[in-house]
Amino acid sequence: NYYTREVYEGVGNNDRHKWVDESLPFTEMGWEVYPQGLTDILLQLNKQYTLPPVYITENGAAMADTYADGQVQDTDRIEYFQGHLQAVSDAAEQGVDIRGYFAWSLMDNFEWAEGYEKRFGIVYVDYETQQRTIKASGLAYRDFISSRHLAKSA
């Protein structure tokens, strides 16, 4: 599973301080969007341990989804997936045996720490009616899966 990186710097006496790059975009969870971190950790682990086949079983982002006119135009989530899928591709090109990638999550759901407040899904769920609507990110993910090629971001 990979969602973001965390970088800490020592500040003396065994204390540490979390370092955050404010120039990066952030998710609704307050996490940096840093796809290069996924490439970096895969390459580092493969160099150190010679990894067996790898499956990325969870990768996704809670974003500020707005349901309007029967649609959710979540371009920030599309960009998140494009960046992270490219990161996986980059690691594979450099020798990591990656066999699978799974977006988190198919549908907006109950998150153990956030309840229904944060939406990770590529399918929007109206919690009152249970109506489901495929988000723009769901359509983009479908297109990637069917073509096995990343669309270039605008």
Which stretches of residues belong to each language-model region?
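Non-catalytic scaffold segments within catalytic domains of secreted glycoside hydrolases
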Residues: N1-A154
